[in-house]
Amino acid sequence: MAVYEILKMGDPVLREKAKPVTRFNSNLGRLIDDMFDTMAAARGVGLAAPQIGIGKRVCVVEVGKRRFELVNPEIIEAEGEQCDAEGCLSIPDYTGRVKRFQRVRVKAQDRKGETFIAEGTDLLAVAFQHEIDHLDGILFVDRVENDNPEE
């Protein structure tokens, strides 16, 4: 497996909307495996394909023992609210408070093209939302809450 270099904020690829995956083949499977390896090497909980320079709607998430490969994901249901510190592998050494949904349901496909529904709460919900944002060219810093409105 390969470990990719993770792009940093400022790289224009991170601001582009990723294209849907239409081919479900061994190349996609290798990409997903490499993304899990890259995420683990960087000690992250999620990674989106644009973060490694690939403009496809693919992301991986691992929270605790729950591991997800999400191809063409979309949030289909969301409720509640949480506001916690968030960070990003593409923006090292920076965290900020971000308001997110507390629970989300995500419709996605796996590496074989099979559709499934994943549900997450708390950190898992944050990870799903954060990675799907990457697929839309949105970075978490775009959503950081201003803790001091006087500034």
UniProtKB/Swiss-Prot annotation:
InterPro entries: Peptide_deformylase, Peptide_deformylase_sf
Active-site residue list: 131
Lipid metabolism is among the record's keywords: no
Cofactor(s) named in the record: Fe(2+)
Keyword Transcription: no
CDD domains: Pep_deformylase
Keyword vocabulary terms for this entry: Hydrolase, Iron, Metal-binding, Protein biosynthesis
Coiled coil: none
Designated name of the protein: Peptide deformylase
Taxonomic source organism: Heliobacterium modesticaldum (strain ATCC 51547 / Ice1)
